[in-house]
Amino acid sequence: MAPSQGYHIHETGFHGDWLEEVVGEVNPRLAALPPDVVMRSLLFQLRAYVNAGFRAVMVLSGQNGAQGDLRLVADEFMKLVPIPVVVRSDPELVRGTFPGDHAGKFELSQLLYIRPDLVDMTRLDRVSHDPLGRFAQNPDAHEATAEYGKQVIEAQIDRVRELADQAGTGPPDLPFLSFDDVEPAWAAVQDRRQSWVSYGSVSG
């Protein structure tokens, strides 16, 4: 397991309009980075995994919406390096079984299961009067429970196992990848910029 990353794509492309709609015209205080920074970072993380000996990579994103851009990076990387890279957001793992959301029953239940100390359900009503805005909170947030979160996460783990089995592994002997070796993949990603889900200027 690689260290998790708390930064993600936001404030650009469709995210910008959505953010204004669900949060309002306030400082959203997000851990956002420009899309090219996140995507390029993923590319070089994939390089690091291969050089460390991994022959398959599962990329799991807790931020739904921009996974198409992460898959684009994975696709271009796989054209250079023969290892499977599977990219999914957490709602995609359980699509058709559990409906995803943003800061609602789906997401809060998962957090209640794994880190209940980070959730204060008494603060749900703040969305109606807090100066920080509406928090993009889903209306069903009050329905969140740790038990529901356990069901979601166990189903996600099962699906990750299935995807990993389906993906298989790459060849054991691969040459060391330099930074320059993967630059062609980044050039290809940039050439497809207008197809990025997060394409657009950084707001603010």
Question: What residue ranges belong to the model's regions?
Answer:
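Extended, histidine- and acidic-residue-enriched regions that form the cofactor-binding/catalytic faces
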Residues: M1-M58, G62-G204
